[in-house]
From Swiss-Prot:
This is Plastocyanin. It is a peripheral membrane protein. Residues 1-102 form the Plastocyanin-like domain. Belongs to the plastocyanin family. Its cofactor is Cu(2+). One of its GO terms (molecular function) is electron transfer activity. Cu cation binds at residues 37, 87, 90, 95. It comes from Dryopteris crassirhizoma. Keywords: Chloroplast, Copper, Electron transport, Membrane, Metal-binding, Plastid, Thylakoid, Transport. GO terms for cellular component: chloroplast thylakoid membrane.
Amino acid sequence: AKVEVGDEVGNFKFYPDSITVSAGEAVEFTLVGETGHNIVFDIPAGAPGTVASELKAASMDENDLLSEDEPSFKAKVSTPGTYTFYCTPHKSANMKGTLTVK
């Protein structure tokens, strides 16, 4: 599955912002435009340690951003469920999406 991160006019969005994949299927996030963004999965309160570890591994470091030098990032989640992801610098601008793993 592929997700575009941002756009040419600087909107803080993921396109699409809702994705459904099979367990273990990679999602490729690719930067569009020049504004730096990242992808971080929200770890649900009370999530088992294995799920928390998996979501942390599927996330970029909060201090890293996609750029022209590194324009894409692949994430994989194997545990079925619905997970929220967001861009750390633009979280307050509601730049988020959901990944459903079947």
